Design a protein with these regions (language model features):
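Short acidic capping loops at alpha-helix termini that bridge into adjacent secondary structure
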Residues: 6-8, 69-73, 100-104
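Short, acidic loop-to-helix structural element flanking the phosphoryl-transfer center
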Residues: 10, 18-49, 55-62, 86
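A short, structured active-site edge motif that brings together acidic residues
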Residues: 10, 68-83
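Phosphate- and divalent-cation-binding pockets in alpha/beta enzyme and binding domains
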Residues: 32, 57-60, 115, 135, ...
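Acidic, Mg2+-coordinating phosphoryl-transfer loop and its flanking beta/alpha structural elements
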Residues: 104-143
Length: 157
């Protein structure tokens, strides 16, 4: 664990983000992501990003990869402390009038499944992140190994 008396959380968060942001330029877009985003747009799905990243970082990351045109909104936090994706998602749904039951949240962690449940959305988990398929299957009945599988799965949910 961390001794926050010796290393305050804001200090640790800032140091983490320095290292994290330094590696971002080397991260490529996941295989089949662009094709899947295009397919979902053609299918009429409204797409937004809900992230624990700071919003200005998120905008920069999405824009640098030429993906901004796919999303109606980029929902990121106001600071680097990653406090509440649930609140961000809930506020977005309330503000837009979107029915949470009509939403599908795509993520890659069991935390994403917990966020989806908290806001009332269905969750699809992608195995391309750092958590195992077995762990993801405990969190959601919908788990995919390739983003290209997403459009067909959405037709069945």
């Amino acid at each position: 664990g961390f001794d926050f008396a010796r290393h305050p959380y804001p200090e640790l968060a800032a140091r983490f983000m320095e290292h994290y942001n330094a590696g971002v330029p080397g991260c490529a877009v996941t295989a089949h992501a662009v094709d899947t985003l295009q397919t979902l747009a053609r299918m009429g799905w409204q797409q937004a990003v809900l992230s624990a990243s700071r919003r200005d970082y998120l905008i920069e990351q999405v824009s640098a990869r030429g993906l901004q045109g796919f999303f109606t909104e980029l929902l990121g936090l106001a600071d680097i402390y990653g406090v509440s994706k649930v609140q961000l998602g809930t506020d977005y749904l309330r503000r837009t009038g979107i029915d949470p039951a009509a939403c599908v949240m795509v993520g890659d962690t069991d935390h994403d499944a917990a966020v989806a449940a908290a806001i009332g959305a269905t969750c699809v988990l992608y195995t391309g992140g750092h958590q195992s398929r077995a762990r993801l299957e405990k969190a959601s009945p919908y788990v995919i190994d390739d983003l290209a599988q997403l459009p067909a799965l959405l037709e069945t949910i």
